[in-house]
């Protein structure tokens, strides 16, 4: 981010720099209006030369890297857990849970009630800790199988690569529980043989052509945040497996302020994209929970959804144009028109393809001016059912905020346990008064309360009008305004919740989240039945302590909603916790489908859920997908075996 940081510094010193930069980007948008004209072949060569300058192609680049994700990811991110190396939940010297580092609003703050919540909810004994491997042992990694002719041509193309064990292991997995558990205690049976780092579209074309020439297997990787086994290497793959890492394709190529679009390389992370657009006064508004690490190409290939989709749309609503390199050649449309009637939409063959057809290299996406005003809120309901009814009415009246999330009671209790220590006596008094007012004066049962968090953004006057409309609807369903602070805190927790699983693993707790979508008339029954199924399955499989089984409604639509489930259990006394966990999760998925839910709302299918795909889309639909795969990639070069 050296270039972006330099631009930001210049803008602070000279306001004219902002205007000048914006004018240049507008001009670039007109001059480079067609994606195929940017970047130029010479630019591609220059980036490759810089990447390999002064060293062999296998070495780290001499030039500064511009994106958040470096080539050596392990220098910044955990190799066997979620997120940044400097951020983790632990027990501090006072015996309180604390998040280390300085990256998040919660960092460095004590969470005085979380320890008791963990002990009481999951039966955890904090005197008993698990052990995990401190680092990757290169001797434990499967040996690299490399085609020497391919390697020689890769060197001649000056495309950076690595055969180091730590680089290969880091790209052998996503973030499913099974994958992280294996990293802590064992090793994968099969990992990539080589990691390659293209720096532009032309590099990807060269790599794919070489893979076709020598019949090699390619598994693309972006942010590495997959939760569907999407990155796991097939154990019986005998060909050289190439991990094609797009993280160095991380530029905004142009911004067109007339058409409100931006053309970007597909390896740019969400946080880099939003930060750079913000410098020019724009945003995409696409904010998945994995925003820090996930990339544009990954969003497209999994049909991602962001928490503010009510205003900005899901990824399929944001993409105007895209370019994909396949074994048959490059797929892209000839026009960037906003809508076309040219048969089935080619974009929808690419969206959701999960790395099985090719590599997405560039995309044109819609942008919007950065909202001038943002306001948080929260509403407490007597129970979950009343909350769901309220969200249904808000959706019916087409007045949903940018984001609205409804937590069931157990999720509400968990969120309350994540509340930082209060330093102000007055604030503590106010919190106590609010609790008294809701539970005693209004008669809410603390064990039934359900809470919705709200995020409004846009023009200030319209936001305030919108806010009043939503709270008026909530009141009709027994909802009470629960404060802006509670709403804001709920959203600030978004990017730290994933760190909680690593803490659990240290104390014999396995946990996971999964999602679905369902029609409104199925939401309540589905939530109840799935949570009950999880509890029943755990009991039948010998789990000694009642599991955490909870849910929340995270997104709303005219015809239904997205529902997230969270479950975890204490596995002390269980000889094979992974099998118990996976059988329970599979049973929960069966229950979801039996209750009218979808196979996935936005996580995708991967290898984890593909056993249910044919049932979900019909034999004919499955055959259609297979026919596309067979034509586009007849030799199965993109052989991650997701979906089919």
Curated annotation (Swiss-Prot):
Residues 49-64 have a biased composition (Low complexity). Pathway: Glycerolipid metabolism; ether lipid biosynthesis. Substrate binds at residue 501. Residues 10-19 have a biased composition (Basic and acidic residues). The keyword Membrane applies. Residues 601-603, 640-644 are annotated as: Important for enzyme activity. Gene3D superfamilies: 3.30.160.650, 3.30.300.330, 3.30.465.10, 3.30.70.3450, Uridine Diphospho-n-acetylenolpyruvylglucosamine Reductase, domain 2 (3.30.43.10), Vanillyl-alcohol Oxidase, Chain A, domain 4 (1.10.45.10). FAD binds at residues 220-226, 289-295, 302-305, 354-360. Residues 1-70 are annotated as: Disordered. Belongs to the FAD-binding oxidoreductase/transferase type 4 family. Catalyzes the exchange of the acyl chain in acyl-dihydroxyacetonephosphate (acyl-DHAP) for a long chain fatty alcohol, yielding the first ether linked intermediate, i.e. alkyl-dihydroxyacetonephosphate (alkyl-DHAP), in the pathway of ether lipid biosynthesis. This is Alkyldihydroxyacetonephosphate synthase, peroxisomal. It comes from Rattus norvegicus. The gene is Agps.
């Amino acid at each position: 981010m050296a270039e972006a940081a330099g631009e930001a510094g210049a803008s602070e010193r000279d306001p004219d720099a902002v205007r000048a930069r914006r004018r240049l980007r507008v001009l670039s948008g007109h001059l480079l209006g067609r994606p195929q004209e940017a970047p130029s072949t010479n630019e591609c060569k220059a980036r490759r030369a810089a990447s390999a300058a002064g060293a062999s192609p296998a070495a780290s680049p001499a030039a500064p890297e511009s994106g958040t994700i470096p080539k050596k990811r392990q220098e910044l991110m955990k190799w066997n857990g979620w997120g940044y190396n400097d951020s983790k939940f632990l027990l501090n010297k006072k015996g309180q849970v604390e998040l280390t580092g300085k990256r998040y609003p919660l960092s460095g703050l004590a969470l005085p009630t979380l320890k008791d919540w963990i002990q009481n909810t999951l039966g955890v004994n904090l005197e008993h800790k698990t052990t995990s491997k401190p680092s990757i042992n290169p001797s434990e990694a499967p040996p690299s199988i490399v085609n020497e002719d391919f390697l020689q041509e890769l060197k001649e193309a000056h495309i950076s690569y690595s055969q180091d064990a730590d680089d290969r292991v880091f790209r052998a997995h996503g973030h499913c529980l099974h994958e992280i558990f294996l990293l802590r205690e064992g090793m994968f049976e099969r990992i990539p043989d080589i990691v390659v780092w293209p720096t532009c579209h032309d590099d990807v074309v060269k790599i794919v052509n070489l893979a076709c020439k020598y019949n090699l297997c390619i598994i693309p990787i972006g942010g590495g945040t997959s939760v569907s086994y999407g990155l796991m290497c097939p154990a019986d793959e005998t060909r050289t497996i190439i991990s094609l890492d797009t993280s160095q394709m991380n530029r905004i190529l142009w911004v067109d302020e007339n058409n409100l679009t931006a053309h970007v390389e597909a390896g740019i992370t969400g946080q880099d994209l939003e930060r750079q657009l913000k410098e020019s006064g724009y945003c995409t508004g696409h904010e998945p929970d994995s925003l820090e690490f996930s990339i544009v190409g990954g969003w497209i290939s999994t049909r991602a959804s962001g928490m503010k989709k009510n205003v900005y749309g899901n990824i399929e609503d944001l993409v105007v144009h895209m370019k994909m390199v396949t074994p048959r050649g490059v797929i892209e449309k000839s026009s960037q028109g906003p809508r076309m009637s040219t048969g089935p939409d080619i974009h929808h063959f690419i969206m959701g393809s999960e790395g099985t057809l090719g590599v997405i290299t560039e995309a044109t996406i819609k942008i919007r001016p950065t909202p001038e005003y943002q306001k948080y809120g929260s509403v407490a309901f007597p129970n979950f059912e009343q909350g769901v009814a309220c969200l249904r009415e808000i959706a019916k009246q087409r007045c949903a905020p940018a984001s609205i999330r409804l937590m069931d009671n157990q999720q509400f209790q968990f969120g309350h346990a994540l509340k930082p220590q209060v330093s102000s006596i007055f604030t503590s008094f106010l919190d106590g008064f609010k609790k008294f007012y809701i539970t005693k004066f209004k008669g809410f049962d603390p064990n039934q309360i359900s809470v919705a968090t709200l995020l409004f953004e846009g023009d200030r006057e319209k936001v305030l009008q919108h806010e009043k409309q939503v709270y008026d609807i909530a009141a009709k369903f027994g909802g009470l305004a629960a404060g802006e602070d509670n709403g804001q805190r709920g959203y600030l927790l978004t990017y730290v919740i994933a760190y909680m699983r690593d803490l659990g693993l240290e104390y014999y707790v396995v946990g996971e989240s999964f999602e679905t979508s369902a029609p409104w008339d199925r939401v309540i029954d589905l939530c109840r039945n799935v949570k009950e199924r999880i509890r029943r399955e755990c009991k039948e499989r010998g789990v000694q302590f009642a599991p955490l089984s909870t849910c929340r409604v995270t997104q709303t639509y005219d015809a239904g909603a997205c529902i997230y489930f969270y479950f975890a259990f204490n596995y002390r006394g269980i000889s094979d916790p992974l099998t118990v966990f996976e059988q329970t999760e599979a049973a929960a998925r069966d229950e979801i489908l039996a209750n009218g839910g979808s196979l996935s709302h936005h996580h995708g299918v991967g290898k984890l859920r593909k056993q249910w795909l044919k049932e979900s889309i019909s034999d004919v639909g499955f055959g259609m997908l297979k026919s596309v795969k067979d034509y586009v990639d007849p030799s199965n070069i993109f052989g991650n075996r997701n979906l089919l």
